[in-house]
């Protein structure tokens, strides 16, 4: 299986909108062999080497990202840009996501992941705005520690002959990337698809269980964390170590304008906007030729098994002269939705980069990554958020006149039809979308994100 070069599949002569990079210096790295990538479909531990793509040996950047689509996808355009500049990029990912890295010109080293446990333990529950339940917090901490312990020796071995020069680390994920960066004494940059937090605004207030209520299991997990950190040569204080996750420079995949209290964040916070890749990994898409407006409905890839909501969307728009695209996200099947009118199209997944330029309205779960891509194309949004972060995004969409929102429990065909009609005809929303597109353009996207990462590289000795 050949690794794809940046630009694979792009028609000859198509210009790449890529800057040469304001920090294009060779880092002080040896000319080591390229890190083998794990070819999807081969057993764990068996690697195939990417074909030699030339003699350029600039820097090696490793991405350690929470293994969820809403965290991995926002980074792919940055990886694609870095690869196009001649850098080597490697992702640490589970097997089922490795192909995304390969398609943007990166490589992947894989680790085992129990998807059922990940979904059960790591996704905040829809009825809670924060980790106020100690049992929920304990499950998150236990998953983090278990996954760090399981992946650290595997990934340290995989990178042993080709250490990276910079680690891009998702603050939401396990600690392996941070611990390895500390061992290797290399820079770390946060890679954050969600909001920044400071003393002025935070999505999740810190979880602070009262001393009289501390579960013995929390004491045990804290001791495990101390032992793990000590074994790997860093502070044995988990609280102090966790604080480093939110310190230092960071990439945030939204414009500063969309960030709550955006003006209060210092220049360590780089709000680069959405960084969608040019490469596609969900096939191709062509808009129906009947000329009708297109409404796309998506509930993401987590809480998407909601046939009642999909049916409400169908009923809301079935008599309109519109095409309705239902994107099921791998949860339900078309048969779960009952009979559908002729203007309804059903897909499991779609390439957003192909669909959004032709979309007139997005009805979705409020996922920040998808919302940013839609807004980059000037598409208004009606959000139906389940979880804390999407609720924050839905509220921000309404505040900035980019669309509207309602809770899933409030969704009816009548309400949805009325909100959609208003969103599509409101001049304030059209003006809000125009401003947002300008803010996204000024944020700079993948080129600026790559510049920031290159700024962390050490000049050649």
UniProtKB/Swiss-Prot annotation:
Disruption phenotype: Cells lacking this gene accumulate desmycosin (tylosin B). It catalyses: dTDP-beta-L-mycarose + demethyllactenocin = demethylmacrocin + dTDP + H(+). Its EC number is 2.4.1.318. Residues 1-21 are annotated as: Disordered. Keywords: Antibiotic biosynthesis, Transferase. One of its GO terms (molecular function) is hexosyltransferase activity. Belongs to the UDP-glycosyltransferase family. NCBIfam families: MGT (TIGR01426). Involved in the biosynthesis of mycarose which is a 6-deoxyhexose sugar required during production of the macrolide antibiotic tylosin. Catalyzes the transfer of L-mycarosyl from dTDP-beta-L-mycarose to demethyllactenocin to yield demethylmacrocin. This is Demethyllactenocin mycarosyltransferase. The gene is tylCV.
């Amino acid at each position: 299986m050949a690794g794809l070069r940046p630009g694979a599949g792009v028609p000859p002569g198509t210009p790449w909108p890529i800057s040469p990079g304001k920090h294009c210096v060779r880092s002080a790295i040896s000319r080591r062999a390229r890190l083998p990538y794990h070819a999807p479909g081969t057993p764990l531990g068996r690697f195939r080497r990417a074909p030699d793509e030339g003699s350029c040996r600039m820097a090696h950047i490793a991405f350690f990202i929470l293994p969820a689509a809403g965290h991995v996808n926002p980074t792919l355009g940055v990886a694609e840009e870095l690869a196009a500049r001649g850098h080597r990029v490697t992702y640490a990912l589970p097997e089922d996501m490795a192909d995304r890295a390969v398609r943007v010109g990166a490589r992947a080293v894989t680790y085992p992941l129990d998807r059922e446990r990940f979904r059960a333990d790591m996704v905040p529950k829809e009825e809670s705005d924060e980790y106020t339940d100690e049992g929920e917090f304990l499950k998150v901490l236990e998953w983090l520690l278990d996954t760090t312990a399981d992946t650290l020796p595997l990934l340290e071995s995989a990178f042993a002959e080709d250490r990276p020069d910079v680690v891009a680390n998702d603050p939401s994920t396990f600690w392996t990337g941070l611990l390895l960066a500390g061992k290797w004494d290399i820079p770390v940059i946060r890679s954050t698809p969600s909001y920044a937090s400071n003393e002025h605004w935070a999505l999740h207030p810190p979880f602070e269980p009262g001393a009289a209520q501390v579960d013995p299991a929390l004491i045990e997990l804290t001791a495990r964390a101390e032992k793990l950190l000590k074994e790997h040569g860093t502070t044995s204080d988990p609280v102090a170590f966790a604080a480093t996750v939110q310190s230092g420079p960071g990439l945030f995949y939204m414009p500063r304008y969309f960030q709550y209290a955006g003006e209060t964040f210092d220049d360590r916070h780089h709000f680069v906007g959405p960084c969608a890749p040019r490469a596609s990994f969900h096939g191709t898409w062509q808009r129906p030729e009947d000329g009708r407006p297109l409404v796309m409905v998506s509930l993401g890839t987590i809480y998407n098994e909601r046939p009642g909501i999909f049916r409400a969307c169908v009923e809301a728009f079935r008599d309109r002269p519109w095409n309705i695209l239902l994107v099921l996200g791998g949860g339900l099947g078309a048969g779960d939705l009952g009979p559908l009118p002729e203007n309804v199209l059903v897909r499991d997944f779609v390439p957003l980069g192909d669909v959004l330029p032709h979309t007139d309205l997005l009805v979705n779960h409020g996922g920040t990554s998808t919302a940013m891509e839609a807004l980059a194309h000037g598409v208004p949004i009606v959000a139906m958020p389940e979880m804390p972060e999407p609720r924050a995004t839905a509220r921000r969409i309404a505040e900035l006149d980019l669309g509207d929102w309602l809770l899933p429990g409030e969704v009816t065909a009548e309400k949805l039809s009325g909100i959609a009609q208003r969103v599509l005809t409101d001049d304030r929303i059209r003006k809000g979308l125009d401003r947002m597109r300008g803010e996204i353009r000024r944020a700079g996207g993948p080129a600026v994100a790559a510049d920031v990462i290159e700024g962390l590289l050490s000049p050649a000795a």
